[in-house]
Amino acid sequence: MTVRIPMGVVAREILAGALVLAGVVLGIAGTLAFRSAQTTIDPHRPEAASTLVVDGIYRFTRNPMYLGLAIILLGWAVYLAAPPTFAGPVLFGLYITAFQIVPEERALAAKFGPEYAAYRERVRRWL
């Protein structure tokens, strides 16, 4: 038996689509900021970053690409309208924070020192 959250199909699809679109836009904005700064986008090698990107979308969130993925997952959950699917974005956020973001932050702190510390104080991790 599937439990569904009551919401008009059209309204749900519009909301889901808007969330997915917002997530894609965030991801693209993050990618373009890295390309503009001519630095690596490889999440497995944050120590290879040649520049600390703090402009554009990075003025509002330190992790627009991960935030974009979480919002896409939220859009998918809204589209499916099944309560268990809403765990996806939460679990993704917890996992990516522990196993990707925190290690990236350590590498960036080691590489950029006080500049990264000031950025970290100024801009939130997610929102």
Task: Please state what every model-predicted region is.
Residues 58:
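Solvent-exposed interhelical
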Residues 1-55, 67-127:
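Membrane-anchoring alpha-helices and their flanking helix-loop junctions
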